[in-house]
Amino acid sequence: MIKAVRGTRDLLPPDTELWNRVEATVRDVFQRYNFHEIRTPIFEDTALFARGVGEETDIVSKEMFTWEDKARAQSEKSQQLTLRPENTAGVVRAYIEHQMAKSGGLQKLYYIGPQFRRERPQKGRYRQFFQIGAEVIGPPPSGSESPARDAEVIEMLATLLEEVGLTGWTLYLNSVGDANCRPAYNEALRQALASVKDKMCGDCQRRAETNPLRVLDCKVPEDQPIIETLPKIGDYLDDACKAHFAAVRAMLDKVGVPYTVNPRMVRGLDYYTRTTFEFTHGELGAQSAVLGGGRYDGLSEALDGPKAPGIGFAIGEDRLVMALQAAKPAEPMTIDAYVAPLGAGTNAEALGICRKLRRQGLRVELGDESFRLKKSFEAAERAGAKYIVICGENEVANNEFSVKELATGKQESVARAELAFYIRNHGARKTGGENIEPDEQ
């Protein structure tokens, strides 16, 4: 038997019901904040991630699925392609390629889709995983550099998590400075690491020389006591970065979004500048991050684009759903009605009833005329139906149908024109003042 590849999985009902509800809620929130959907390819030129994400990051150095384009392998300019491990670089690439900066305003873009990393599969972490993300990008006159953009994005995330039903989260904030003040911090890190790096893991020993900031990303437990002794970036921020971070915090205080400043948090991507943030949840264990993001004021220029500061985030949808399921197990799937054809020639009539009910927004399952009454009831219960509509030869002839509420056993005869009203309103009858919907006539 062929099975799903290690690190991937199938999403099945009823779990997909929760995934769909999450995505519908997320789309609604994005629309209220004036974000618009963007869809980018799931694979890109490898150079995009090497230049955009950073060659010293774990993502680029260890975790990417990369191959040579066979269609060009014989040419002088063979191309390396990579399944996208994250989507910010791809969105910024699209922003540059399609000259979206020419609009002069902010581009507020969101995406929902799969990403791919060659990670060790574990609880909540897969080699194919799903992200919900958004980016706010624009040339300087658009206000894209404003700390208000950072605060708005973070406030939107607090709203989003509330509306999908996740409570008990913790928000961590930090500022990682910018190109003006970070070099001094990198040098301070390099000097501090010189005497202790030999006691750290191999990756940290290498990064201490090539990219000291990435040492703070280390997840090796034995290295954490050393990392706690290293200089804090907050002590090296220049006045502009300090003012920006203070403004972000003040706005979050004003709108009532709680946070904790974590001076060690740098996030695992080289493009971040100034504000970085993570939302975590205790149900996810040691690696508790549900989402993370930050500002990336130089990414567009690093990819040969115009100056276009931005801020964005990515939600680990797998991890968000896992946290929601831990708090509240998935509910059984339900439908509004099961229409049971009974007797020869009643299938077409039952299908017609299903069509009318569905056109009124009801969730309906069509039975089979080969089923006896008992089997139809069993099928209706398995389907999670609230009502079963009996469509037999007598019912068809009289244009009235037996409708039974499975939870209570209440059964009544209902005219064809009133079926949708009766089911939608939990057994209520029309009093004569209500109009019959067009599809019920």
UniProtKB/Swiss-Prot annotation:
Substrates-to-products reaction catalysed: tRNA(His) + L-histidine + ATP = L-histidyl-tRNA(His) + AMP + diphosphate + H(+)
Keyword Aminoacyl-tRNA synthetase annotated: yes
Cellular component aspect of the GO annotation: cytoplasm
Primary subcellular site in the record, as a coarse category: cytoplasm
EC number: 6.1.1.21
Pfam family, one: tRNA-synt_His
Transport found in the keyword field: no
A molecular-function term among this protein's GO annotations: ATP binding
CDD domains assigned: HisRS-like_core, HisRS_anticodon
GO biological process: histidyl-tRNA aminoacylation
Keywords: Aminoacyl-tRNA synthetase, ATP-binding, Cytoplasm, Ligase, Nucleotide-binding, Protein biosynthesis
Domain of life: Bacteria
First-tier enzyme category under EC: ligase
Family indicated by similarity: Belongs to the class-II aminoacyl-tRNA synthetase family.
NCBIfam families in UniProt: hisS
Protein name per UniProt: Histidine--tRNA ligase
